[in-house]
Design a protein with these regions (language model features):
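Alpha-helical transmembrane segments of multi-pass membrane proteins predominantly involved
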Residues: 1-548
Length: 548
């Protein structure tokens, strides 16, 4: 009645999943603490969130020391050098955002528990994206990142600009998600698989080129929204201005980096060998993004909007290595290095903006007049971040731009050289608006002669120490900024014992894994010996007389 049929359970590598598991545990702890702690003791919530992020970074470090590439779920989830570097970036950036949020959220009378729960949920989505090697995994991780971010962008419920920020971000995000999902469905229809490696193998045959090109365009457009590339950037300035400042910093760095990570995975794995289909589109996208972003940033009078358009221009630089047919490993290394350095200097710039706003109550560029008179340290730190964003040596931004220029020029064709010229021109344009803000701080007098000091919370001071230290360290130590093979894709394998461990006389052979069986009902009717055998041949027909 029942037949035994083999069922193979998936193998889980708990060490590889440890960063995400720690984050999930932190989510639960923060939510329970917010539920049961009295109102006066909820100040511990940012500490719990920060400790959880640092705790998640510990298994990232142990996995890096272990050095083994790991894969799970049929290759849909990989832990390699690329994934580990990006997980570390997301966790450290998230920790800095928690530091920036500590006093801002407490003093603004916001719901702290829900805020940190949503922030950690979004960071969890980013860590999953770093390991995603499958269309479904990428999409689910993007939604896990985006849905909490929509809510965080509109966190200031009683502010008109805050409501506008949340609404614009949500509506544009839903549209981009639909476009991206349609492109992914076309890829699945052509390849018959959601694994990026399988898609790359099928697309290499060169068949169904029109459908493949359409799928690539839809996917790039969908990710173009996530990274605020022109012309899909229109949500960014208004959202950045209306969202809480720590969330603005978070969206401008971590969220954008996650979008670039997913785009790089798709292009360099699934679209490998399809340069003719996507690189002309990406070339135009990169050139327009950096040029329009810089030109509009020149006209801004609000420092947050200026940094928003600066982020648009920086996105063009990060797209550049993908837009030319150069060395894939060098392009990937340049992108990851740029993302890491950009995170440090941009988060630092937003930390200074928050510190100055505590005194001036304004985000206008004119409110930065005379910062050097009442806080030389803040003015000096902002100068470091601004000139690093402009790519002035010997700061980290210089190294980031050098790696991108090198990856582009190494492609060695006219398209690459043309894009390098566009990048050089835009670097000069960007220096103009960064220098204008620096001039306000160092050369203009303080408004109304007010030179009273800025009172900075310890959390913002800690964020400034971390970001400034990394920005300077990446600049003076090129070996630290050039991630090289630390950011390369690799062919992940399941974790196995090393040869030395296997050959050891003390090694105990592991028993073969148990194969559970599932009882499947046998739908065939029971055998009855009194019934004729259905497999026996039919008897020969005999003539039967018919009586009229």
């Amino acid at each position: 009645m029942f037949a035994a049929q083999e069922f193979v359970s998936p193998t889980l590598d708990w060490h590889a999943l440890a960063p995400e598991l720690v984050l999930v545990g932190t989510l639960v702890v923060v939510l329970l603490a917010d539920l049961f702690l009295p109102e006066g003791r909820k100040g511990i919530l940012p500490s719990l969130a920060g400790l959880g992020l640092l705790g998640s970074a510990i298994p990232v470090l142990t996995l890096a020391v272990d050095g083994a590439d790991r894969s799970m779920f049929g290759g849909a989830y990989a832990v390699d050098n690329f994934a580990l570097v990006l997980k570390a970036l997301f966790l450290i950036s998230g920790y800095v955002v928690v530091l920036l949020s500590t006093n801002y959220i407490a003093e603004g009378d916001y719901a702290e528990g829900e805020y940190y729960f949503l922030l950690l949920s979004s960071i969890l989505g980013m860590t999953v994206i770093a390991s995603a090697r499958d269309l479904i995994t990428i999409f689910v991780a993007l939604e896990l990142l985006s849905i909490p971010a929509y809510l965080l962008a509109g966190w200031r419920k009683n502010d008109v600009k805050g409501n506008e920020a949340g609404a614009k971000y949500y509506l544009m995000g839903v549209f981009a998600t639909g476009v991206l999902l349609y492109g992914m469905s076309l890829l699945y229809g052509v390849a018959g698989s959601t694994l990026l490696s399988d898609i790359g193998a099928v697309l290499a045959d060169g068949e169904n080129l029109p459908i493949i090109t359409l799928a690539i365009v839809f996917c790039v457009v969908g990710f173009g929204f996530k990274v605020s590339a022109v012309p899909f950037h229109t949500w960014a300035p208004d959202t950045y201005e209306g969202a809480p400042t720590p969330i603005t910093a978070f969206l401008s760095v971590s969220s954008k980096a996650a979008g670039f990570v997913a785009l790089a995975e798709l292009i360099l794995i699934a679209f490998a060998g399809q340069e003719a289909a996507y690189q002309p589109f990406l070339w135009v996208l990169a050139a327009l993004t950096m040029t329009i972003g810089n030109m509009v940033a020149l006209r801004q009078t609000n420092v947050v909007r200026m940094l928003a358009y600066s982020g648009v221009a920086q996105a063009g630089f990060i797209l550049a290595p993908l837009a030319v047919a150069g060395d894939t490993d060098r392009s990937l290394s340049a992108i990851v290095s740029y993302l890491v350095i950009y995170a440090a200097m941009n988060l630092g710039a937003f930390a200074v903006v928050m510190a100055v706003a505590r005194k001036t109550g304004s985000g206008e560029i004119s409110s930065f007049s005379g910062v050097f008179e009442y806080s030389p340290l803040l003015a000096g730190l902002m100068g470091i971040f601004l000139f690093s964003l402009a790519g002035i040596p010997p700061l980290g931004g210089w190294q980031a731009k050098f790696f991108v220029f090198r990856a582009v020029v190494d492609a060695g064709d006219n398209w690459a050289y043309g894009l390098a010229v566009v990048m050089a021109i835009n670097s000069v344009i960007a220096l103009a608006y960064y220098a204008n803000l620096a001039r306000q701080m160092f050369m203009e007098p303080a408004p109304d002669g007010d030179t009273s000091p800025v009172h900075m919370p310890v959390s913002i001071s800690a964020a400034l120490v971390i970001t400034a230290g990394l920005t300077v360290a990446f600049g003076v130590s090129p070996w630290a900024a050039d991630l090289g093979d630390m950011s390369e894709f690799s062919t992940p394998v399941a974790a196995e014992p090393s040869p030395d461990e296997a050959a050891s006389p003390d090694a105990v052979p592991l028993p073969p894994p148990a194969t559970p069986t599932v009882l499947v009902p046998d739908l065939a009717p029971p055998f009855d010996p009194t019934l004729p055998d259905p497999s026996a041949p039919l008897p020969a027909a005999s003539a039967v007389p018919v009586t009229p």
